[in-house]
Amino acid sequence: MKVMIVRDYDEMSRRAAEIVKEQILKKPDTVLGLATGSTPLGMYKYLIEMHKNGEIDFSNVITFNLDEYIGLSPDHPQSYHYFMYENLFNHINIKKENIHIPNGVAEDLEEECKRYEREIRRIGRIDLQILGIGVNGHIGFNEPDESIETKTHIVTLTEETINANKRFFKSIEEVPRRAITMGLSSIMKARKIMLLASGSNKAKAIKETLKGRLTTKVPSTVLALHPDVTIIIDKRAASLLTDEELANVELID
């Protein structure tokens, strides 16, 4: 596991965008796994800028988003469909048919989970999976006590996650209680994983992730089993790390 500790959110975003850019330059038909929320926003802004400057061509890139709220239509301002188009897809030359996001209003949600998993397998493998991390260590919407064997599935969100996401809604009552998410097994099949974290509120989750102790109580600890993980964190997210924990990882510049 490689760890990069950077100055602040902006530097985290820039360094993450550079890694995505390098991946696409190396493999123009790269399959990206994408995340939503405030953490990757800065990275998306840098990717848009790089595209406008002619540094990246997204025309052959394929994307799979980690998750989507159940009950929110694609045009709902808080749906992850809407988020991705507003903050990335509308500003780059990606083909619509190459964009994949779970359908949170599908008539048969269980079948939608199976369909999404089949589509990932049909394409092959995700080349670079981008992750954020929740305050409780969730990745995607895989909450504590989730089996590491899960594929794309329906999940009931914890109160902790609902409270963390209420800032995006007018009231906590509007926050969806369920979501479709790629499972831990789906995520771990990616060739490479890049996890981003910024801010002191993520420090405890990062500390648990880097302890090297696998526990279902902290879903992100499963990443220790993956052969190619890069974690980019700012100084505040790294603030609780000890020398012992840092000794377990490869620090990179």
UniProtKB/Swiss-Prot annotation:
It holds the Pfam family Glucosamine_iso. The active site is at residues 67, 136, 138, 143. It is an enzyme of class 3 (hydrolase). Its EC number is 3.5.99.6. One of its GO terms (cellular component) is cytoplasm. Keywords: Carbohydrate metabolism, Hydrolase. It catalyses: alpha-D-glucosamine 6-phosphate + H2O = beta-D-fructose 6-phosphate + NH4(+). Catalyzes the reversible isomerization-deamination of glucosamine 6-phosphate (GlcN6P) to form fructose 6-phosphate (Fru6P) and ammonium ion. Belongs to the glucosamine/galactosamine-6-phosphate isomerase family. NagB subfamily. NCBIfam families: nagB, PRK00443.1-4. This is Glucosamine-6-phosphate deaminase. The lineage of its organism: Bacteria, Bacillati, Bacillota, Clostridia, Thermoanaerobacterales.
